[in-house]
Amino acid sequence: MTHIRAIYTDGACEGNPGPGGWGVVIYFTDGSVHELGGHHPATTNNRMELQAAIEALKAWRQLAPGSAIALYTDSEYVLRGITEWIHHWKRRGWKTAAKKPVLNQDLWQELDALNDPLVQWHHVRGHRGDVGNERCDLIARRLSRGQPIALRTLPPPLG
């Protein structure tokens, strides 16, 4: 049985705000790779980073539910948000320490609903040669510009 070895996520935005894209690369223990990506015509970089993480967790739940995964992001915003800040935001009724509404609350709530103790969140430094991060970055940047990119996908299940 094959398992997910690692998931990488990234988001990009041409201008901030502006057109954006997100990318997800899923590596399996058998060497196969599954990639996802999307575009939004008017967004921010942080929203695309969050969307990438959301789509990664949706894919994990579909492809390998119940298995532990390592999820890598170059976004400190996403990493600290989901592992540290979110607990405080929820306790304060989705307000920051300054009593202001949490930005991107809709996406944070969606990510929180998908998150699971089986997900191990990791930071990877962007643009440092990490193959998974570089591929996600390329997908996100291409899609933010509306440029085509061939995504590697798994064949549909038999039956």
From Swiss-Prot:
Cell compartments where the protein resides: Cytoplasm
PROSITE patterns named among the record's database cross-references: RNASE_H_1
Keywords in alphabetical order: Cytoplasm, Endonuclease, Hydrolase, Magnesium, Metal-binding, Nuclease
Known EC number: 3.1.26.4
Residue ranges of every copy of the RNase H type-1 domain listed in the record: 1-145
BP GO terms, sorted: DNA replication, removal of RNA primer
Pfam families: RNase_H
Signal peptide coordinates: none
UniProt-annotated binding residues for Mg(2+) 1: D10, E49, D74
GO molecular function, one term: magnesium ion binding
Residues engaged in binding Mg(2+) 2: D10, D137
Enzymatic reactions: Endonucleolytic cleavage to 5'-phosphomonoester
InterPro entries cross-referenced by the UniProt entry: RNase_H, RNaseH-like_sf, RNaseH_domain, RNaseH_sf, RNaseHI
Note on cofactor: Binds 1 Mg(2+) ion per subunit. May bind a second metal ion at a regulatory site, or after substrate binding.
Keyword check for Glycoprotein: no
GO cellular component: cytoplasm
Entry-linked Gene3D superfamilies: Ribonuclease H-like superfamily/Ribonuclease H
Key word DNA repair present: no
Cofactor annotation: Mg(2+)
Family: Belongs to the RNase H family.
Function noted in UniProt: Endonuclease that specifically degrades the RNA of RNA-DNA hybrids.
Oligomer status and interactors: Monomer.
Protein name in the entry: Ribonuclease H
Originating organism: Thermosynechococcus vestitus (strain NIES-2133 / IAM M-273 / BP-1)
